[in-house]
Amino acid sequence: MAFARILKACKWGIAASIAIPAVALAQSHPEFVPLARVSAALYRPDSGPAPHIAFLVSHRTANNLNNIACKELAKRGFLALCWNTRFQNNEASVRWEDIAFDVKTTVDYVRSLPGITKVVLLGHSGGSPLMSYYEAVAEAGPNWCKGPDKLIQCTANMDFKPADGIVFPDAHPGNGVQSLRGLNPSVSVASDGTYKVDPTLDPYNPANGFNPEGASHYSKDFQARYFAAQSRVMNDLIAKAQAKMTLIKEGKSTWPDDDLFIIPGGGWSGAGPGSSDLIAMDPGIPELMSTARPEKLLKNDGTIVTEVVHSVAAPEPENAKANRTFERGTKVFTLKSFLSANAVKSTNALSGVDWCSSNNSTMCAVQSIKIPTLIAAMGAFHFIRDQEQMYELSAAKDKDYIVIEGAVHGYTPCKACEKTPGQYSNSDKNLFDYIQKWANARF
């Protein structure tokens, strides 16, 4: 069981931090750096000239001290700081509007280091809304995270200095969007605690197109009903959470500050297994798993072609079992962590997301980010179209979008996707070589 869970996590790259022995060889002497509420590991090149470019790598909750990116970037001549936020391994404690101050701490730190003249933010997975949130506020000012349409507004004084560049390797649109698309709208819990499933909306019902042995194929009709139902469920959850917060403010709740907020069928509280996102079972849905137009594809041999790119992601039928469990299929938040970091308004989970209703939104933030921007989608995962859309929305004049052939979410080769052994063997090398060339050409 434990081994299977590690394999699953590696597929997601949730635990780009799991492979400790391999990553520990990133440099001879990585240095642990305590920075107030932030813990960090500083990676420098073992040889060559002293670096003048620093990369910052983090995730909103995951342990990133041994992230593969720091090893690979240090190996290519950069200084890299891999760090953990104050909310490490505690999804329920997240107060999103405070998290940008942790980015500020690390930006200020690396700018103080001798020889560092440029700072590049690297936002992968849950690090993408983190880094983009900071940068959007740094460039547009604190009014960016305020307003009547926001689920939660920032309130503190935010005096942030912009970075010099930002890289999004397999960024996702935001945790609220991930929660929305991962909801199982067929699930409900009766007042007596009974778990109920509506078979007409059940993504794990073979009558709806589910295949327990491989890739599922959901009809357009089912997809339309499903995406609409996900939106209704999320909006209902938001209304429920807001109503409970009102009771707390009125002194009519059990506790004076916060309360538990549980979402059955929502998937794991962190990223990864248990999600009922249709593309996890049916990787052939083009609206999410293909580019809308010809884009650059970095092939395994290092060449670049331009074509409509389709994800080669493997299906995850095992989510059917995980989604029915408490451990892997139930999100456990508090009212505040849900509303601030894991909710988003919408009219449709596919085509009607209100990107800027949440401050945890890469899609919203890129519209205010003007520093040089590199967006790199992994060709064997779920964010090819999302990242193409980030590129389209980006306010940067200097911006680039590319897909890395055969890479899973954690950058490494998708061996389960290969038709011939070694077909995607260079995926991680190709990604970091491309980042190296991109950064050196600009900074």
Protein language model features and the residues they cover:
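Conserved alpha/beta-hydrolase
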Residues: 73-90
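Short beta-strand/loop motif that positions the catalytic acidic residue
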Residues: 369, 375-377
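Short beta-strand element of the alpha/beta-hydrolase
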Residues: 51-60
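Alpha/beta-hydrolase
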Residues: 199-364
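Primarily recognizes the serine-hydrolase "nucleophile elbow" in alpha/beta-hydrolase
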Residues: 112, 118-191
